[in-house]
Amino acid sequence: MSRPTVLAAAEGKKDWHVLRTSREAVRLFIADMVHAVRCVPEALAEVRGSLHPLRAKQALETVFAELLLMAAFGLYLLLRLPAAADLYFSIMMPAAIFVLIAFALFVQSCGGDVTFGLIVSTLIVLGIVLQLMLTAYAAYAGATSPRRFLVIHCVSLITGLLALLFFRCVLRMRAVHAAVFLSLLTAACYLILFVFGSAPAGTNARAWLCIGPLSLQLTEIAKVLAAAAMALVISDTDRSGKARLLRSFAILAANGVFLAALGELGTLLVLTLVYACLLFVFCPDRTELRRATLLKMFGAVAVILVCVAVFSAVCLRASNGAKVAVIREVRTAAPAVDGDTRTIDEKIAAACARDKEAAKTCAPLINRVGNEVWKVCRRVLAMKKPEGLTDEQMLALGVDNYQLRRNNMAAASGGWFGSSYEMDRYTMVVAESDFVFAFVLRALGGVGGIAVLLMTLALLICGNRRLGAVAGRAEMAVGYAFLYALVGQMLICIAANIGLLPTVGLPMAFLSRGNANSVISYLLVLFILYAGRRPQKEVSR
């Protein structure tokens, strides 16, 4: 037999072997999916079995704590906006009892982190309060339906429990098969948006699927599926470190292509942050984050933050010293020097001109960092003037985005403790969703904004503490992915609302209004709480 004939026969055998291997892989994948479907009753029984009955005293303490939380926020509304308080007590509070008490009892029954659950309950009530306070705006009067908002919370809690059961079944598959299955569902969401997706007026992101009066932001669902797929791949111990790294990056890159085509760069930013955090946790071969490692990590972060703060102060002084001095003078209403007849706008324009001159003598990095730090300083300095900045002054300071400009003007007028007068002086844009943190600064002031930021960081710390001790590696990985997606999106939304990042159009968990956002928020926290549950023996102690 000639050599070409032998080579042709060998190639044919190789092709047949590849085809047979592919068929076998597909068959195993389908068999794994069928097994996961058949395990639904078993997974449901497992979830029910992990919920232990509560003692009467424990249940009463839980109910009393939730009622006290809602009463405290109701009293705050009664003092600030009596009209909104009437809606709160007559419509929102009765149904919120069913949502909050059911959620709190689930946390206690499954042995979840009580602190984590209490923070989530506070965010839920705060979201209800903010949506009701929006009714004080003439532009939002009638736009926020309390009954509809309440129904969304009830349905979202039930849907979140069903989604928790879905992921419990998916985790019964092999890690690689589960990742492929979730990736296929993610691709299906993107294809549906390409064919049937729509974009709100004034945006280019085709992220919504409208079915009659109902609209769903499918990219929120795709984000969760993609994050879980990356977590399963990157935590798969059956693969080498290089293979896990490349496959997880391939999932991120594929999602990046779809999201860029849809115009959803904010969701891509969240997934990138989740990917980076998962790499930090799982690329070293360790099954959990030990407390010592976690303390070292926070210590390193603290040192880095101190260095960044010092460097930022130097950059701010070098690149924006003139602007800071003049704006501080404007905000404190300092008396003008004799013979100084310049207006406020002229002073700001002169400060900006001196800032540009200083930039010519600074290194590009120093000037860039100084301008970013200035965005934060502008917010702090503006708090000293109750009516905030005018539209012309915001333009003079370089804020040319209309939505960000209007919302920053309104946020600056909130001061440190919020302001309820002249609610229509600044027409806020998308304050119920994407710019809800700007409305927090407007209605609750800087203190309220700091409280929301601290609660977000507390979610990260509590979640890390519990998830680091989870026995199942796949469950721990998905829990970490959900935690970083939840907290990461909240931090990105906060940064975008105060001008540290470009406008990304992302909602905040529990504070923003939205169908898909509400469902996904409940799913994320329920999965994190259930994954970090303690055994019944530990709970009963």
Language model features with spans:
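Hydrophobic alpha-helical transmembrane segments of multi-pass inner membrane proteins, especially
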Residues: 86-399, 438, 442-499, 523-527, ...
